[in-house]
Amino acid sequence: MKQTRRILAALLTLICLAYCFAAAESAVFTETPLPDPSAIHSFEELPWYLTLVNAQHGVPENWVIPAFTELKHSQRVDSRIYPQLQKMFDDARAEGILPVVLTSYRTYEDQKNMLVKKYRKYKDKGMSTEEAQAEALKVAAYPGYSEHQLGLAVDIDSADTEKCGNDTVWDWMKRHCQNYGFIWRYPGQKSEITGISNESWHFRYVGVEAATYIMSNQLCLEEYLEQVYGLK
């Protein structure tokens, strides 16, 4: 009986340590005070499809998307953008282009777990807490500050790279996306404004009117919102 109690006590200790370790890793990303997403996202005058999410503008954990449409590979998007996304893909395929959505909507919890996973990866390489945090944030945003939490953004690759390479897919998307209300969200030349380095695969729905203006004038979303709505 005593041995059983000792085993149970040891197991409880291990569980508590594991929980505390995980909580500490998650908490490391909140040690530096961040803007409250619910406070900074006060753009009621903006249409839903122009919601801005970047390092300065976030959405709260309880951000509501009215309805989702399921895609292949366990992906899903805001149902309001699905018809245009599907039409864009259908038209691309008619021209021999083979796009597929690799990443779309992420929950707040998904984003948090992704960030912690990246942090652990760098810690395991021997980096300090500060170094690991800095490296993790280069490839994963704080929860609430990723466009993927809007359900309006998709990462697109080729469904068959032997028949149609990724670059071919991305080039087609960049030339035609505005016709369907999408923009190439993170061009390399706009990285100082967006805070994101070149991502040829990341496309974001903003509506046909805004997309046409943005792509025709080689703007990023931040520049468009400043010009049209005075948002900084």
Can you name each region flagged by the protein language model?
Residues 4-25:
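Sec-dependent N-terminal signal peptides of Gram-positive bacterial secreted proteins and lipoproteins
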Residues 19-232:
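Extracytoplasmic cell-surface/polysaccharide-interacting catalytic and binding patches
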